[in-house]
Design a protein with these regions (language model features):
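Acidic, glycine-rich loop-and-strand cores that form catalytic or ligand-binding grooves
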Residues: 134-171
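Extended, hydrophilic extramembrane loops/domains of integral membrane proteins
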Residues: 178-180, 184-212
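Short, contiguous pre-domain boundary segments
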Residues: 30-40, 115-122, 129, 192-197
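Solvent-exposed, polar/charged alpha-helical surfaces in well-ordered, non-transmembrane soluble domains
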Residues: 50, 54, 58-61, 137, ...
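Electrostatic cytochrome c docking/interface patches
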Residues: 29-54, 65-79, 83-84, 200, ...
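Post-cleavage N-terminal segment of exported redox proteins
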Residues: 2-43
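Structured domain cores in non-transmembrane regions
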Residues: 75-130
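C-type cytochrome heme c attachment motif
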Residues: 54-65, 118-124, 135-144
Length: 212
């Protein structure tokens, strides 16, 4: 009986050791942020939404699409509420493929408010190949698509850390405690002062992660 108990203790100890790496790779619950839009009576902060679009345009748009939104959505009530002229200028800053013309040829033209946001890649395959085999998710409805919503996205953006001792990562993989397995293929793209906000707000990592 004593030998059996000793064996049981040894097996239990070995089991605890084997489980330790798994426990260290568990996702951490997202940080809870006091969002202005929280609750039934919450409203979006117009200035924050405009800053968030600036972060998207200057940082995120090189990889992430917003294919379910049109440029005119930027001027709608409850959103960033850019003026009509601002929306036209934003849309016109993009070259949109259109056609065919009378000769059957495709052509490019300046964007219009009615156009969908231009995607950075022509298709899913191209986007996946350009990002190490990981498809950058579309950001149109990302908050609704992710468990934890805005808290989760914010946490991931501020959650990059050096891996703890004993944890090794493949090339092109980064440690982030808010991701499943604590691994993410998207590099840490935010750093203090990266964007010069049009309204003069200091662009800390925390601020940009909240705005976008």
């Amino acid at each position: 009986m004593i030998k059996f108990n000793i064996k049981l203790l040894v097996l239990s100890f070995l089991l605890l050791i084997s489980l330790k790496p798994l426990q260290s790779a568990e996702m951490v619950d997202p940080i809870k942020v006091d969002w202005s839009f929280k609750g039934l009576t919450g409203t979006f902060d117009r200035a924050s939404l405009q800053r968030g679009f600036q972060v998207y345009k200057e940082v995120c748009a090189s990889c992430h699409s917003m294919q379910y939104l049109s440029y005119r959505n930027l001027g709608e009530p409850g959103g960033p509420e850019f003026s009509e002229q601002e929306v036209k200028a934003i849309a016109a800053s993009f070259e949109i493929e259109d056609g065919p013309d009378s000769q059957g040829e495709m052509f490019t033209r300046p964007g219009k408010p009615s156009d969908k946001f231009k995607s950075p890649y022509p298709n899913v395959q191209a986007a996946t190949a350009a990002n190490g085999g990981a498809y950058p998710p579309d950001m149109s409805v990302l908050v609704k698509a992710r468990k934890g919503g805005a808290n989760y996205i914010y946490s991931v953006l501020v959650g990059y850390e050096d891996p703890p001792p004993g944890v090794t990562l493949d090339d092109g993989v980064y440690y982030n405690k808010y991701m499943a397995g604590n691994k993410i293929k998207m590099p840490n793209n935010l750093m203090d002062g990266l964007v010069e906000y049009a309204d003069g707000t200091e662009s800390t990592v925390d601020q940009m992660a909240k705005d976008v």
